[in-house]
């Protein structure tokens, strides 16, 4: 089983990946919950085995907002293979596992990405079964992370401006700092609450883009692939992908 999986791509739609996490700490769930409530720091797993390939000293944390709950046993995961040492699996360092919350069909995320990739650049996605300290936690959707590796593969460079459009403090009812591409003026500090800069530079580019979008719309095609953007809006609306730029919090892109 494991040898056949190793021969396949990690995101091959026809295979279910096997991920086995081992913590040396018996209170690993409490530690992950504590890390999540305190700013989403990583907890070190003793080992993580992916289809039989074993990695030691791996960063692991719970992810998600509405899909995470400290009182449930099946929470979404973010596994970062290179938190503490340089290592990867088939070139992938970040592994994002969703717990398929509120989707009894188990199809929504994986099928949606299958549709999206026909019209635009989008992550690959399949399934993985997860074990922790020998106990099976369940079946997860396994979707490719939008990382610098992903950007380099599809845009042929990871040295340019790279911005995660999620408020660092989180978005939700009662908050108003949304990454909605509204022009907030020329002071980069006015954008810090709504966006997370993942590259060494880029605030000036974000400001220039939002300024163009508001004040110089006839020049927008110099900065934005309008055709791909329209496909993105069609996808978000057609498949009711509201946890996106098209949703109320205008995030997760």
Predicted region positions:
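Regulatory N- and C-terminal appendages and interdomain linkers associated
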Residues: 4-57
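TRNA-binding/sensing appendages of the translation machinery
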Residues: 8-12, 20, 98, 104-114
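Extracellular/periplasmic catalytic domains that process cell-envelope and extracellular macromolecules
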Residues: 12-15, 40, 52-54, 69-73, ...
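A short, sequence-level motif marking secondary-structure junctions
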Residues: 25-26, 59-68, 142-148
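Conserved oxyanion/phosphate-binding beta-strand-loop segments in alpha/beta enzyme cores
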Residues: 44-99, 198
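Zn2+-dependent metallopeptidase catalytic core
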Residues: 45-51, 55, 107-121
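Internal "kinase-insert"/substrate-recognition segments embedded within catalytic cores
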Residues: 78-86, 99-100, 118-127, 132-239
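Catalytic activation segment of kinase domains across protein kinase-like and atypical kinase folds
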Residues: 244-253
